[in-house]
Amino acid sequence: MKTVLADSMMSYLAGKVKYHKANVLVYLQSPVGIGEHPDIMAAIEEELAKCAEYHEKYEILGEILMGSELDG
């Protein structure tokens, strides 16, 4: 059960990182197409912050899982 939960969480976090990276690419490639975000720079910064948040969670979970594997 632990492995299923850990794998699921790692996949979820990796997916969220990819999701927010894709949003940044969309903003960079066609900023005029995003009408609800008049401040493109702020929108990009917000997406980068979300990406960093999920990336950090992914890294921390990986460290926890590596530590638990070493402990037995």
Predicted segments — roles?
Residues 1-72:
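Extended, charge-rich alpha-helical interface modules
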